[in-house]
Amino acid sequence: MNVQKMLMCMIVKQVYAKTILSKSKVSDYTINPYVGCEHGCTYCYARFMKRWTGHKEEWGRFVDVKTNAIDLLQREIRKKRVGKVWISGVCDPYQPLEKKHELTRNILEVLSKHNWPVTIQTKSPLVLRDAELLSEFGDAEVGFTITTADENVRRIFEPNAPPVSERVKAVDELHSAGVKTFVMIAPVLPKAEGLVEQLRGKVDYVLIDRMNYHYADWVYRKYGLEYAMNNNFFNHKKMELANALKREGITYQLLF
């Protein structure tokens, strides 16, 4: 991944959000420090945000930076009942721009000060920057989305995301630092079963889900992967992964 070249093609805007701490069906609350995501994963459901934000750019080619996120959170957190916060639902909170803007880190500092529990969902080893801060939380967990063990498959579906090996290494480092960790194998892609042995001793649990959207149908067809789009594939992989995780003694949950 050539991050410098990717950023040259990125439309980045500074925006002022109206709110930052939102109710969520996945957790009690969700915080999205950014609109859009540099990873540009072909299957990402969050591309629906284009409809609500007026972006005409291709998904993965725009990011709005919520410059007032910290001020908003400091005000809103005083008015809300304590609950678990999911960071994030429609962006990767540790996408490359986070290295510069540090919105996610500053958000974590506010949540930690007020003793709010947090769940982070990312594909980026940049989260290691905040390992010490996360270890100080009373209740924090970090989840990595890893959909395949095969780098060739990863490049097809997640062209600008960090390599699988970097994610596995980051999970291991966080787990060793005492941070609760999980991996979300979702959507299940070809060669996902190769992840199980790599995750032994590195995660507290694994979540497994199928492809639930059709944004990436053209990718499957372009690369001759139609076999991996149907129910038979997902059901077979579900059982294969479940059996392998059970053998390795890894706690897991099937989401389909």
Q: Locations of the language-model features?
A:
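Non-cysteine beta-strand/loop elements that form the S-adenosyl-L-methionine
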Residues: 132-150, 204-217
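A general structural detector for well-ordered alpha-helical segments in enzyme core domains, enriched
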Residues: 72-73, 103-107, 130, 163-170, ...
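Active-site beta-loop-alpha junctions enriched in small/polar residues
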Residues: 90-92, 123-125, 145-149, 186-188, ...
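Surface-exposed amphipathic alpha-helices with a cationic face
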Residues: 109-112, 135, 168-178, 242-250
